[in-house]
Amino acid sequence: MGNLPSAAKHCLNYQQLLREHLWSGESVAGALDPAQEASQLSGLPEYVKIVEVGPRDGLQNEKVIVPTDIKIEFINQLSQTGLSVIEVTSFVSSRWVPQMADHAEVMGGIHQYPGVRYPVLVPNLQGLQHAVAAGATEIAVFGAASESFSKKNINCSIEESMGRFEQVISSARHMNIPVRGYVSCALGCPYEGSIMPQKVTEVSKRLYSMGCYEISLGDTVGVGTPGSMKTMLESVMKEIPPGALAVHCHDTYGQALANILTALQMGINVVDSAVSGLGGCPYAKGASGNVATEDLIYMLNGMGLNTGVDLHKVMEAGDFICKAVNKTTNSKVAQASFKARLE
């Protein structure tokens, strides 16, 4: 073939590249690769915790009910990828979210692997009681920085929701159950448009003061940009340390990874994502899924940031659930990798 141009060599070595450190995040023993050295110099976190929300946030908007055994197998596959947190279901009324009607069966059916946490979403005290009865040992509550979204999503005002959450969090803490808090519409609302950073800060501070160990700031509509992410985080971080914050980005406008990078540069090291980019929001028409876990891991691996997660195994779990629900993956990494395998 003679002397090949550099670009051609890269094409020929594409499969090999995918098998190397961008897949696993591993570097040569005893040495930092250039990406890891750069991450340390730039002040980026050395470790990023990924909170996998695919089984709950990813599937809850699916119109066709996913069989319980499929959900259980999906979660069991994710549990073997190195992920340390997998949000498995939601103890909400089946009238509001039919997809989550089998929450107790899912909770009782999964194999809970050592070192993996399995939080569930609860809307109120009744949901907490049902979750605990089903074996849940960690929960999350779901608030909003938008009055309109709060009323559409949980059928009450922000102030009313805070009253509910205070009861839930207090009760959970008495049972030594950790509580995570979500704040949706942190960068925009489908009904109100732009949301003032101060409003996000107020809601986040209240949840944190009640006892939530971590506040996940959600770009529910996926309209955020690195600029708006930076402005919002600067406001919230005046009241809550970055170590108690996470970001939850939807990719409607293709900004999720850029927004996540901005958050990492500001000291946040917890990121929510969903395998295959599953998700959406029934109360935010047009919003696409969460940032794909595969794409997030690929980016973090390429930056030399440790996640402890096996990209190949995550892709296999994504392939499983996409086939089960008859969907095409939204992960760019999965699309490119599967295509390369066929060539």
Swiss-Prot record:
Pathway connected to this protein: Metabolic intermediate metabolism; (S)-3-hydroxy-3-methylglutaryl-CoA degradation; acetoacetate from (S)-3-hydroxy-3-methylglutaryl-CoA: step 1/1
Enzyme class: lyase
Residue stretches making up the Pyruvate carboxyltransferase domain: 48-315
Example of a GO MF term: hydroxymethylglutaryl-CoA lyase activity
Catalysed reactions, semicolon-separated: (3S)-3-hydroxy-3-methylglutaryl-CoA = acetoacetate + acetyl-CoA
Statement: the UniProt record of this protein carries the keyword Lyase: yes
Binding site for substrate: R56
Family assignment from sequence similarity: Belongs to the HMG-CoA lyase family.
Protein name: 3-hydroxy-3-methylglutaryl-CoA lyase, cytoplasmic
